[in-house]
């Protein structure tokens, strides 16, 4: 189970965007994710008339490693860690849910 999922509010812990908050929009693989408004780089693009693209400088959001972000706890207003708690579901099966380590509150889906 991934501790940080698409739609979670995260805060950047390290790098040039330290302290910025954003929403996870995409998981690239097991260790990298794309956060909206964070790690924006400028790419120089050539014009391609076959694809109908114009050349110039394009801003693009690049992936960031998941170790450099932490989930944002709205109740405390700070970064928090994620834990996994096993509970009994309605049908009697075991269900794993994500919880905040500081308070033990369940993390709701976005």
Curated annotation (Swiss-Prot):
The keyword Iron does not apply. It holds the Pfam family ribosomal_L24. The keyword Cytoplasm does not apply. SUPFAM superfamilies: Translation proteins SH3-like domain. One of its GO terms (biological process) is translation. Keywords: Ribonucleoprotein, Ribosomal protein, RNA-binding, rRNA-binding. Belongs to the universal ribosomal protein uL24 family. PANTHER family: MITOCHONDRIAL RIBOSOMAL PROTEIN L24. One of two assembly initiator proteins, it binds directly to the 5'-end of the 23S rRNA, where it nucleates assembly of the 50S subunit. This is Large ribosomal subunit protein uL24. It comes from Variovorax paradoxus (strain S110). The gene is rplX.
């Amino acid at each position: 189970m991934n501790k940080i999922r698409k739609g979670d509010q995260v805060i950047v812990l390290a790098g040039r965007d330290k302290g910025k908050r954003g929403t996870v929009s995409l998981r690239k693989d097991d260790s990298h994710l794309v956060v909206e408004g964070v790690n924006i780089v400028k790419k120089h693009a050539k014009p391609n008339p076959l694809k109908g693209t114009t050349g110039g400088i394009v801003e693009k959001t690049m992936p960031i490693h998941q170790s450099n972000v932490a989930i944002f706890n709205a109740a405390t207003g700070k970064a928090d860690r994620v834990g996994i708690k096993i509970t009994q579901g309605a049908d009697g099966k075991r269900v794993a849910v994500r919880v905040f380590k500081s308070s033990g509150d369940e993390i709701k889906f976005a």
